[in-house]
Amino acid sequence: GEVFWTDFGQHLALRQNLEALLAEDERGRLTRALFNLPEAKDENGNRLVRASIPAGADIRGALIVDAEIRAPETLIHGGIVIGGSYGRIRMPQGGIAMFGTAGELDFDGPHAIAFQPVLPSLRLPEGGRHATVLTQDGPLQLFTNEAITDYRGDAYAQPLEGNPVSFDEAARLVDKTASA
């Protein structure tokens, strides 16, 4: 066999590896097996594992694991939701939401990822990224985009995308919180 290699440290690699969970090829089957996810799908092409979804929601070709979605107005086509509790999710072109608590998630294009969103509502553009970072001073909402591929220099040391702090400062705040 071949070596299975994955890199979750880069935005593009993270997205590609998570989206492999939906793929119907050998890599998709291997990735699902590594995470002990089923091959079987429901009548709408979804893989649902300990998922609570409302009647009437338009969910097709999705993977939903350990998540609750409450709003019947939800639209997920080819999206991934792992962990969390959500009101309405709108992912007409896919996207990934992980470990969040959000009233409304709106993804305006493919490839958006929301990690641990703790917000009443969140809207991401195509390739958008969001993370709620927990610090001693409270949660920080950080944004970036898959189009940004180089986080050296000013891209790391200066706030980007309207963020309240730089990624460098966010890392220091997380370290401070972890060591407290």
Q: Would you name each region that the model predicts?
A:
Residues G1-A180:
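Left-handed beta-helix
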